[in-house]
Amino acid sequence: MKKFAMVFPGQGSQAVGMLADLANEYPVVTETFKQASEALGYDLWNLVQQGPAEELNKTWQTQPALLAASVAIFRVWKEKYPQLQPSVMAGHSLGEYSALVCAGVIDFKDAIKLVELRGKLMQQAVPEGTGAMYAIIGLDNDAIINACKQAEQGEVVSAVNFNSPGQVVIAGAKEAVERAAALCKEAGAKRALPLAVSVPSHCALMKPAAEQLAVTLEGITLNAPATPVLNNVDVKAETESAEIRTALIRQLYSPVRWTETVEKMAQDGVEVLVEIGPGKVLNGLTKRIVAELQATSVNDVTSLDAVEALLA
């Protein structure tokens, strides 16, 4: 069997109707959403299946929805392929919480409430319309970091997601981000695309949210991971609960080092990356980071059935 990693997507991968066909074949999907709904106090499965999209896209609802979707797919995987165990896990931003639940670190219901709170705190930290995020395509990291420094002028703007070589996301105060995006274009970026988000994640504007999240996180029991989980902030697999807590708090205002995460997996002998969650965002990034890695996304019956042959 090939050595494989499981990776879990973050916000942007959600879609109304996700997991519908898996739910028809595997009752554990709706059972998982029922547990999430009990923790939240509203019907999450109904929101995910019926929408509307503008409700699902509110960050405090997106985050529990994606966490529940990834955990549901993972539980289906464990039912169908108990013999197929990943050697390592990681998640992109919110996906780190999915990875920690699937690695046995955080109780599922605790995590659902935690990511709902994370979404609310993130939204409260920056009034809607005052922050922005742009994807910068086709410019090297150093040039982007320099553009952000030049654009600051006393405001927050920084590189926040190192997604793949030539794809970096910047975030911060709206005007500063727009200045930085223009400077990136001047420096030779192919494109600077505004992202449809209500919150500028992973920049210094999220520090107040992180401080409040820390208080709640302190009261949650964390277990030792059954599978190593590489974190976003240091690309390290922490085993002590204090370190895992600190990494989750820092994650809110620190860059997601995804390129390095995938490179580390490849260096450690991983041959296949399996994305557990809706969409194919991480699958697409993998091929741009390490071309020789195989990548697949498992989010419906067809992809679930096909994965065994890929890992053989």
Can you say where each PLM-predicted feature lies in the sequence?
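Short, solvent-exposed amphipathic alpha-helical segments in soluble enzyme
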Residues: A23-N24, Q150-E152, K185-A187, R288-A291, ...
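Non-catalytic positions within long, well-ordered alpha-helices that form the structural scaffold/packing
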Residues: K185, A266-G269
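Short hydrophobic/charged patches on amphipathic alpha-helices used for structural packing
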Residues: T259-E263
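FabD-like malonyl-/acyl-CoA
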Residues: K2-I144, V272-T302
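Short, flexible loop segments at boundaries between secondary-structure elements
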Residues: D234, Q294-A312
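Alpha/beta catalytic cores of group-transfer enzymes, especially the acyltransferase/condensing modules
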Residues: Q11-S13, A103-Y253
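Short glycine-rich catalytic loops that host catalytic nucleophiles or stabilize transition states
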Residues: L195-S198, A266, N299
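Glycine-rich phosphate/pyrophosphate-binding beta-alpha loops
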Residues: T62-P64, P200, P255
